[in-house]
Curated annotation (Swiss-Prot):
NADPH binds at residues 196, 198, 200, 236, 238-240, 244, 247-248, 274. The active site is at residue 58. It is an enzyme of class 1 (oxidoreductase). It comes from Mycobacterium sp. (strain JLS). InterPro entries: AKR, Aldo/ket_reductase_CS, NADP_OxRdtase_dom, NADP_OxRdtase_dom_sf. One of its GO terms (molecular function) is aldo-keto reductase (NADPH) activity. This is Aldo-keto reductase Mjls_1918. PROSITE patterns: ALDOKETO_REDUCTASE_1, ALDOKETO_REDUCTASE_2, ALDOKETO_REDUCTASE_3. CDD domains: AKR_AKR5H1. Belongs to the aldo/keto reductase family. Its EC number is 1.1.1.-. Keywords: NADP, Oxidoreductase.
Length: 283
């Protein structure tokens, strides 16, 4: 399925298992204040982004919605993602939370609604998945998926619901390339979406990354984004800097060689910079 989203900036889209599609590169607004988020989303949409990723726990859904609604871009051309907080997990509460997110965003629907964390000790992510299925059925969300789910979490919800997430958004960068989980996702027909693609900035001065960047006359950030896109991921890059937001788009005019991909793949050491989904329980 093709999409006009992102075409102005040359951002391709990938098809999801439910017939919808999503741009392969988007802006994330985690840890940004409301004012920062509103400015960043406005700058991103002006630059050509069409995928915006927020969450209830970020506290900036209203700001994202203001920027989206003020952009003058037709709603159907913008792909908006938000996420269910751990505190709102449950069959009924997840549906209420989805509608509350819509109200804060000032939108009639979201393109993608995700369970933010499995929070396994709470025992509610399976019930929450049922709630998301109902939210999709009711038109609150066009696609539904998960974040930070491992293979066991995925099999639990799929085996019990007979409904497969469209996306699994996970921390993913060369120090944590998630090869096994990407393979699991692909086996289910789930698109892998990468967050933290720059390794919270720790990879920007890594010799392997800077070497590849110099070879292509690109920035380290552009190389890291390109690496993840070439793996077949959708990538969410967070920034509050308009220049970096624009620069991050300049990843579709070059390709990494097989050797360069292998070099970056070889950096994997299982290093996480974000919480471990096996143990994290909130918020």
């Amino acid at each position: 399925m093709t999409s006009t989203r992102g075409e102005a900036a040359g951002i391709p889209s990938v098809s999801l298992n439910d017939g919808h599609s999503i741009p392969v590169l988007g802006l994330g607004v985690g840890e940004l204040s409301e004012s920062e988020a509103e400015r960043s989303v406005a700058a991103a949409l002006e630059a050509g982004y069409r995928l915006i990723d927020t969450a209830a726990v970020y506290g900036n859904e209203a700001a994202v919605g203001r920027a989206v609604n003020a952009s003058g871009i037709p709603r159907e051309e913008i792909y908006v993602t938000t996420k269910l907080a751990v505190a709102d997990q449950g069959f009924g509460t997840s549906q209420d939370a989805a509608r509350a997110s819509l109200e804060r965003l000032g939108l009639d629907y979201v393109d993608l609604y995700l369970i933010h964390w499995p929070a396994g000790d709470h025992g509610k992510y399976i019930d929450s998945w049922g709630g998301l299925m109902k939210a999709k059925q009711d038109g609150v969300a066009r696609s539904i998926g998960v974040c930070n789910f491992n293979a066991e979490h995925l099999s639990n919800i799929i085996d019990l619901s007979f409904f497969t997430p469209a996306i699994n958004q996970i921390e993913l960068h060369p120090l944590l390339n998630q090869a096994e989980l990407r393979e699991v996702n692909a086996g289910y027909g789930i698109v892998t979406e990468a967050y933290g693609p720059l390794g919270v900035g720790r990879l920007l001065d890594h010799a392997a990354v800077t070497g590849v960047a110099q070879a292509h006359d690109k920035t380290p950030a552009q190389v890291l984004l390109r690496w993840s896109i070439q793996l077949g991921n959708v990538v969410i890059a967070r920034s509050a800097n308009p220049d970096r937001i624009t620069s991050n788009l300049e990843v579709f005019d070059f390709e990494l060689t097989d050797d360069e991909m292998a070099t970056l793949n070889g950096l994997d050491e299982g290093t996480r910079f974000r919480p471990d989904p096996e143990t994290y329980t909130g918020p």
